[in-house]
UniProtKB/Swiss-Prot annotation:
Species assigned in the record: Methylobacillus flagellatus (strain ATCC 51484 / DSM 6875 / VKM B-1610 / KT)
EC number: 2.7.7.27
Family recorded in the similarity comment: Belongs to the bacterial/plant glucose-1-phosphate adenylyltransferase family.
Enzyme class: transferase
The protein's name: Glucose-1-phosphate adenylyltransferase
C-alpha cells in the first residue's frame, strides 16, 4: 500500500474492525491503600461521575474498536456491575460487544498468574473471533487515545508487536517498563521496572516508558503465548517475559503517545497513572482548574459511563451564617450542598454537605454524608462514609494520623471502616 493509504480513515476503519481489545482489569491496585479494599482499581470512581475503566473503554468505542473483552479477577463485583449497567449499548447483530472474562480456570486449574497468562487463559475465546489484531490495554490509566492511529503505525512498520510509550521523568521511570529504540523506533532494549533506568539519548532527565498498551498480530500473539505458557521459568508477564524475549528475534516497534493522543493542548499530552492516593487526589484536583488538561467536555471524544438516574445538584440557603455554594469544583447529580461552602473539590453523586461545613481541595466519593460544622482540607473520602458533626480532618495531621491514612504529600484518606462504620457485612 501507498503511504497515504496507510493513514486514510477508511484504512484505519478496516483495521479497527479487525481488532479485538482486551482490557486487563484484574489488578488490586494496592498502592491506592484502602480505596481498593473492596473493589478492583479499574472500578475506582474518578472525575465526578466516571470510573477509571471508562477511559480505555471509551477510547475503544471512539476509535472504532467495538469488540472488547474485560479481563477481571480481584474483587470484581463493582466492576462487573458497572459494565453490565453502563456498557450494554453495543449492537450484537453488528458483532459488537463488551464481554466480561473473569478468571475461571478455562485452560488450567489456576487463576491468572500474570498479564500474559490472563490473555493465554482466554485464548480459545480469542481464536473464535477470527480477527487480525489484538489490542491489549491496562484498565487502570486515565487518558484519551486514538487506537486506530497506533494500529496504522503497526501495519506501516510491518511489526509483529507495537508498544505504546511516553517520556517520563527519569526519577519516576523505575515504576515502568523502560525501553531503548533505534532511529526507526524499533525496540532494541527493554527492562521492566529497572532499579537504575536508562535515560533518553537526547534527554538525560527523561526515560522512554511503556504505557502497558500493546498491538499484536493475532496469530503471532497466540504462538508466543503458548511458547511462554510452556516455559517453566517464565512469570507469564508481558513486561518481564514476553517483550524482552521478542525484541531479540522479532519486529517490535515503539509508538509514541504524542502521535495518537486526543485533545492535547499546546503539544502537551494527558496520561495519568492514578496508582497512589497522592496521584489519584492530584488528578482529580486538576479537573477543578478553569481549563484542565483533561477535557471531559469534548463532544468529539466523549467519555462514556453508566448514567445513573439522579436529580440535579442542589444548593440551598443564602445568608451570612450559612450559604450553600461551590466554586472551582465539580458537583455531580444528586448532591445537596445545604448552607455549606465547597471550594476546589470534586463531589461525586449523592453527596450531602450539611450546614456550616467547609470543604476544600477534597475528593468526596458517592453517597457520602457530611454533617454540620465539618471541616475537610485535602481529604479523600471513600464511598458511603458518614462524617459526624463537628469533625475536622486535614487541619491537624498528627491527630489525623491516629485515625486515618496520611500520604507523603499530606492528603488524608478516610474510609467508612476507619470511622467504625461497617458497610460490608460478612458476619
Amino acid at each position: 500500500m501507498q503511504q497515504h493509504e496507510l493513514s486514510s480513515s477508511r484504512f484505519v476503519s478496516t483495521l479497527t474492525k479487525n481488532t479485538v481489545a482486551l482490557i486487563l482489569a484484574g489488578g488490586k491496585g494496592s498502592r491506592l491503600r484502602d480505596l481498593t479494599n473492596w473493589t478492583a482499581k479499574p472500578a475506582v470512581p474518578f472525575g465526578g461521575k466516571f470510573r477509571i475503566i471508562d477511559f480505555p473503554l471509551s477510547n475503544c468505542i471512539n476509535s472504532g474498536v467495538r469488540r472488547i473483552g474485560v479481563v477481571t479477577q480481584y474483587k470484581a463485583h463493582t466492576l462487573i456491575q458497572h459494565i453490565q449497567r453502563g456498557w450494554g449499548f453495543l449492537r450484537g447483530e453488528f458483532n459488537e460487544f463488551v464481554e466480561l472474562l473473569p478468571a475461571q480456570q478455562r485452560i488450567q486449574e489456576e487463576w491468572y498468574k500474570g498479564t500474559a497468562d490472563a490473555v493465554f487463559q482466554n485464548l480459545d475465546i480469542l481464536r473464535q473471533t477470527n480477527i487480525e489484531f489484538v489490542l491489549i490495554l491496562a484498565g487502570d490509566h486515565v487518558y484519551k487515545m486514538d487506537y486506530g492511529q497506533m494500529l496504522a503505525a503497526h501495519v506501516r512498520n510491518k511489526a509483529d508487536m507495537t508498544v505504546a510509550c511516553i517520556n517520563v521523568p527519569l526519577k519516576e521511570a523505575s515504576a515502568f517498563g523502560v525501553m531503548g529504540v533505534d532511529e526507526n523506533d524499533r525496540v532494541v532494549d527493554f527492562e521492566e521496572k529497572p532499579a537504575h533506568p536508562s535515560s533518553l539519548p537526547d534527554d538525560p532527565d527523561h526515560a522512554l516508558a511503556s504505557m502497558g498498551i500493546y498491538v499484536f498480530n493475532a496469530a503471532f500473539l497466540y504462538e508466543q503465548l503458548i511458547r511462554d505458557a510452556d516455559d517453566p521459568k517464565s512469570s507469564h508477564d508481558f513486561g518481564h517475559d514476553i517483550i524482552p524475549y521478542l525484541i531479540k528475534k522479532y519486529r517490535v516497534f515503539a509508538h509514541r503517545f504524542t502521535d495518537s493522543c486526543v485533545g492535547a493542548a499546546d503539544g502537551n499530552y494527558y496520561w495519568r497513572d492514578v496508582g497512589t492516593v497522592d496521584a489519584y487526589w492530584e488528578a482529580n484536583m486538576e479537573l477543578t482548574k478553569v481549563v484542565p488538561e483533561l477535557n471531559l467536555y469534548d463532544r468529539q471524544w466523549p467519555i462514556w459511563t453508566y448514567q445513573e438516574q439522579l436529580p440535579p445538584a442542589k444548593f440551598v440557603f443564602d445568608n451570612e451564617e450559612r450559604r450553600g455554594q461551590a466554586t472551582d469544583s465539580l458537583i455531580s447529580g444528586g448532591c445537596i450542598v445545604s448552607g455549606a461552602n465547597v471550594r476546589n473539590s470534586v463531589l461525586f453523586s449523592d453527596v450531602r454537605v450539611n450546614s456550616y461545613s467547609s470543604i476544600e481541595q477534597s475528593v468526596i466519593l458517592p453517597k457520602v454524608d457530611i454533617g454540620r460544622h465539618v471541616t475537610l482540607r485535602r481529604v479523600v473520602v471513600d464511598s458511603g462514609a458518614r462524617i459526624p458533626d463537628g469533625m475536622e480532618i486535614g487541619v491537624n495531621l498528627e491527630l489525623d494520623r491516629k485515625r486515618f491514612h496520611i500520604t507523603e504529600q499530606g492528603v488524608v484518606l478516610v474510609t467508612p471502616d476507619m470511622l467504625g462504620q461497617n458497610l460490608h457485612h460478612i458476619r
